[in-house]
Amino acid sequence: GRYGQQAHDQLAAAGVSAAIEVSGDAQRQAVAGAVTAARAGRLGLEADAVTWAAQRTYDTTWFPDVELVPTTGLVAGLRQVKDDGEVARIAAACAVADVALAEVRSRLADGPTEAEFGQELDLAMRRHGADDVSFETIVASGPNGAKPHHRPSGRRITEGDLVVLDFGALVDGYHS
């Protein structure tokens, strides 16, 4: 399905070759193959992400000879550690965001609206190599600066305004 295709495409873009199995018998076969190849007697399940019904199916039908161990945050913990290639990709995304802001910063003096400035910043990130923005860019000026997650509005940025920016670039699958 589309989730498997998206995962495949994103992994391929990051230079990773992997079989993607989202659900069903193909998932069971993929996991069983990995458990067998590793000669694993235990299999960790992310307790916050696996339903009770799925856990029972795994325990009684799919892997009756394997001890299932509930885990919490195991995968997230592994993702916290970055290799040199990942650090380089994150640094590249940060550089794109920095260069983009440097390019459009002077436009603040022209009095654009928050929305206009946000659009210019997003476009500048793309011009400098971003595949996308990391999230919806926040531009909040004057009294809007006190609003968490303010959406850029038609308010004009004027001299003396405090301007709060929250933005990021997505480059090669990594966010700044």
Language-model segments: which ranges?
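Basic, ligand-binding patches in group-transfer machinery
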Residues: 139
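Short, solvent-exposed amphipathic alpha-helical segments in soluble enzyme
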Residues: 13-17, 37, 59-62, 154-156
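Short glycine-/acidic-enriched loop or helix-start segments at secondary-structure transitions
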Residues: 8-9, 54-56, 174-175
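Flexible, acidic/His-enriched mid-domain "rim/lid" segments that flank
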Residues: 26-133, 144
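Acidic/histidine-enriched ion/cofactor-binding microenvironments in catalytic or ligand-binding pockets
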Residues: 37-39, 133, 145-175
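N-terminal accessory/capping or targeting/presequence segment of soluble
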Residues: 1-34, 95, 99
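Short, glycine-/Ser/Thr-/acidic-enriched flexible segments
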Residues: 2-5, 50, 144-146, 168-170
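Short pre-catalytic strand/loop immediately N-terminal to key active-site residues, enriched for Gly-Thr
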Residues: 21, 87, 152-153
